[in-house]
Each structure stands twice: as C-alpha cells, then as structure tokens.
Amino acid sequence: MILRTNDMRSNIGFVVIGRNEGSRLIDCLESIKKFAPAIVYVDSASTDQSVHEALTRGVHVLELDMMTKFTAARARNAGFSMLLKLYPELSYVHFADGDCIVNESWVEDAISFLEQHPQVAVTCGRRRERFPEASTYNQLCDIEWNTPVGKAKACGGDAMMRVSVFQQVKGFNAHLIAGEEPELCI
C-alpha cells in the first residue's frame, strides 16, 4: 500500500536533535516540514539561536535539563516521548540530526518500503556529507557513511522507524554516549 501525501503527513513524526546547529538546523527543518506537521526539536543547551529558529518555524521544542548528561540517545528518547504525547496516532517516527537535510524523495520511499515489508522495523538511507571537499574530515565521513545498500544489521541516527517497535524495545539505551543505534538494532 502506497500512502498518499495526506495519509503520510498524518502518519509520520520527526524528532530532530541538536546543539548550536545554527543555519544547519534551519536547513534541516526546512527539508522536513513539508512532510509532516509533527516535528519535535530537542535542544541540548544551545547558546545560539537554534531554539528560536525552531520555534519560528512552528516546531515543538524540548530543551533538555542540563543537570543530566547529554547523549543523543537521551535526546531522541525525550523527543519521541514528547512527539507521542502531542501526536499519539503516529505510525512512524523519523529521527534526524539537526545538521542533516532529508532528501526530497526519502520520506515517501521509506514509508512505502516499510508498508510493503511489515517484518522490517527500521529503514535508513545513504547519509552523505554535504561538502566532502571542504576538509579531509568531511571526506572521511562521506567515505565511512558509504555503507552497502540492502539488508543491514544496524542503522545510524537518521532513520525511519515503526513507532510500535520503538515502543516495544523501550527506545534507545540512554546510558550510551555513542553507538545507541546499533545497540537498539540488536
């Protein structure tokens, strides 16, 4: 079953995490707002205008308490909880880092894939460095992210997941400072 745009918009929510992302966050939010109104931005004590920029775009914002250690897993879990309180009917959640742009065709492709493969819990695409030529580090990131296409044992931080399965496994392990996505997929 292929979802029509209106069905898709009511079925999916986004959790975006970040800290001091600046214009990268603006680009991220602009790339996803056309797909769904259900967007939560989780901010980890930004000192720039990230929170203001998200609010200006009509995005729900959750500012994490600085008394507890920041981790991507903690931020994603908190954002997911807020998202479901606001939009309890969602079938899919897309997690994204605030410095990432979601490709125009990705969301519909991801939902279509999950609809056609009910045994699959999560799908992710090819993450690309926006400016691989800018530095050796950027180039190495782009090379590292060039993972094989097809069935995988794990996903990265930018992925579409079934809400029911994410709830069933009780989210990411918030105690991990990194690698929470592969651990979730075990």
Which role fits each region the language model picked out?
Residues R19-F35:
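Short, well-formed alpha-helical segments that are part of the catalytic scaffolds
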